[in-house]
Amino acid sequence: MPLVLMTDARKADWAAAARRLPRGSVVVVRGQDSKKRLALAETLYGIAPLLIADDPALAARIGAAGLHLPEKRMKEAAHWRARFPHWIVTSSAHSLRALMGAHALDAVFLSPVFATTSHNGAKPLTPLRAAFIAGHAPVPVYALGGVTAQNAARLAPSFSGIAAISSLIP
């Protein structure tokens, strides 16, 4: 099952994590601080294909493989696809209703499937509910949120892959 490494603001050896990914994996470069996001993207460029989160200008500037949009910007996918037809365009989603607007995307990251420390207090969808949602999606769906090597086996075949943070960093 393909893997996606999602970065966040924590100090971690993201380059080492990216190098450990199996062939065909992708890294989504996220972060609120634009300077830190740029530095991280430059560090990771060439290690694995990069999707830049919520920053199309940076994605174009560094020659990223694509763009990752937050759920609230999912409707922009068709615009960015028209401007950059070679890009992979993804988005986050947190419900079945959100996924119904995903037609112009290449994939969606459905979260949180399990309880996760990166979004404390967020109610997990549960593997059963998440599988139901993924099974009705118009595009491939990746499970995100609290996914570990131990609980990944609980994910249904309706998922196209797994996206993770903590379980993929050394």
Q: In which residue ranges do the predicted regions lie?
A:
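Short, glycine/charged-rich beta-strand-loop motifs at protein surfaces that mediate ligand recognition
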Residues: 115-122
